[in-house]
Amino acid sequence: VDARERGEGNGVEYVFARKSIAAGDVAGLRPGVLEGVITGISWPKSCRWGTTSEYCSRPVRWLVALLDERVIPVRFAGLTAGNLTRGHRFLAPGPHGVATAADLLGVVEAAHVVSSEQAREAVIREGVAQAEQRTGARAELPEKTLLEVVNLCEQPTVLVGTFDEEFLRVPEEIIVDAMLMHQRYFPLYDADGKLTNNFIVVSNGDPAHADTITGGNERVVRARLSDAKFFYEEDLKHPLETYVDRLDEVVFQETLGTMKEKADRIVALAKHLAADAQLSEADAADAERAAYLAKADLVTNAVVEFTSVQGVMGSYYAAACGESDQVARAIADHYRPRFPGDEPPASDLGRIVATADKLATVRGLFALGQGPPGPPAPFALPRRAPRIAAMLDAGPHVTLAPAIAAPLDTT
């Protein structure tokens, strides 16, 4: 009580007390602190390793914890920290002794592990630039995939592989998806922006075996593209319209029903919006047709396997079975804008179908009481309204109120 004091913070008066704690051995305090740091790290995807209960992003095989030259006995996942680390699994696996904390980075660098994420990225970018110079092509390096690759490698080596030109007859989007999303390869484009049959792979293996590593990755991509080609050719055996009824096999949302029911709502909303926008009779018919076919590719082989090409594949299939260019383009564009800064569909018809798609989701979830504020909204709901607004800004002029107010089952 005698140690109490008064103080003010942010305009509020507080009563507090001061307590002095005697100095302690830092090394003795560190284990608990460091264990708390490790257990406090969370990942969207976690795993458990062996018989321990701790969660981690990848199995933890060893721990190093030093204060100067003293080992801090941190315990985690059944392991106790020491002063031994390991290097690149092929070039210098170790173990390697670490005399002091200051030596750690030097030890792992000498063991062929580039410890800095920024340094590994710089190595990859430099290797890609050299590959571009050798091939005369330009690489696509999406930030998300590049970040993954940077963190999959300890000592990256950039290699160039090749696949058979026959696969270039498959829609480019499937090839790119197979390489970027499934294999973490980077596609190469010629001076005209056309996809080539070369690709970049970043290896974490022994550079002395570059030819063997390249050949192995070429076999992998050949198998993946063979699957893509097969799926595409199988899908083309049936008109796009035949896939529409199969949307009844896909649940959109438990209460709102199947994707077929959502597709029916998109059609009805597109008719409302096309009439309100005073589209020509031909354009209104195309809007209704595009809305009817927009989700059909979700049950095709190619999209089931390569989900990021939804809409795009529907466009290819629509064109292949004789739908108009305008309908095919609207199918491809109806997911746009996909993210902030993405352009809305280029045509009035495309924007009508895209608005109908997003509006069908927004009003359905609001009808269920799942709109914000509240728990995290499903289907990225808070982002859909700004995307609808972006399309309204681009035209054509429509009034949403009648479409929003219409019954869900009849719109």
Language-model regions, residue ranges each:
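Amphipathic alpha-helical "coupling" segments that flank catalytic cores
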Residues: 1-411
